[in-house]
């Protein structure tokens, strides 16, 4: 598919025949990750399809690294992904019957809002809006020292 304003989407379907058994074909694209791949998955907590930040991270980072966006962009992105990873760990603890800490519970609540407000494919925000929403989520669920972002950026953006 070619887009009028530039860019394209190319899909190449691949099927793996495990052991050559044609009766058990497995659709597979894991061995064919290409430039520009964004990994989508259904988030069971919010019931929407999201851009999976863990599997899409290199593609998402290339939109930030060395680019002219807001000076807080790289640190906000790194903190958000780290907190989202902490939530994934907390979810694993919960599913395995371990007690959750207050921090674990806050990361789970953060992850739900983060997925719904930023990662869901029905979200359409520009970079400034995305950063502002993320700062709002940080200040809603965490203390400034928990997000591990430079103090000057926290002072400029926290709770605004």
Give short role names for the model-derived ranges:
Residues 1-159:
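P-loop NTPase catalytic core
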